[in-house]
Curated annotation (Swiss-Prot):
Family: Belongs to the NrdR family.
Pfam families xrefs: ATP-cone (PF03477), Zn_ribbon_NrdR (PF22811)
One GO process term, biological-process aspect: negative regulation of DNA-templated transcription
Cofactor or coenzyme needed: Zn(2+)
Region feature Disordered, mapped onto this chain: 1-20
InterPro entries linked to this entry: ATP-cone_dom, NrdR-like_N, RNR_NrdR-like
Database matches in PROSITE patterns: ATP_CONE (PS51161)
Originating species: Nitrobacter hamburgensis (strain DSM 10229 / NCIMB 13809 / X14)
Annotated ATP-cone domain residues: 49-139
Cross-referenced NCBIfam families: transcriptional regulator NrdR (TIGR00244)
Keyword flag Ribosomal protein: no
Protein name, per record: Transcriptional repressor NrdR
Zn-finger region bounds: unnamed: 3-34
Amino acid sequence: MRCPSCNSLDTQVKDSRPTEDSAVIRRRRVCMACNFRFTTFERVQLRELTVIKRNGRRVPFDRDKLVRSLQISLRKRPVEPERVETMVSAIVRELESGGEAEISSEIIGEIVMEHLRSLDDVAYVRFASVYRNFREAKDFEAVLGELSSEDDARPVPLRK
């Protein structure tokens, strides 16, 4: 592993441990040339995924881009970063285990919306507004109508 401070390849792992959900291994490293300490994360990648964009272009799947788009949707929302990371891992696992090496951006968007809907309604609407390219207020009203009709269908817990 190359040192991010001096670019030396002479680094050593000082500590290695799994994260809470055991999906990622956290490694604490030290550069032998400059003594700079840094952390890396290692996760299993089942297969190389390619995203087919709406214009037909093919690009490698970028987990970090998914994280950034979710963080934008969840900005100033009361959702713990651990829950976001768990959701991202679940989405990536679902994509990788789908059997296809190439996945359309539409499918990825639908899967993300499914996960966001169960996590945070406001983030869901924010993501949907970009993903579905909302142009008018009635587009927001339609999504809000979907959410409220789902809420009406949910059983109300009994109070004791």
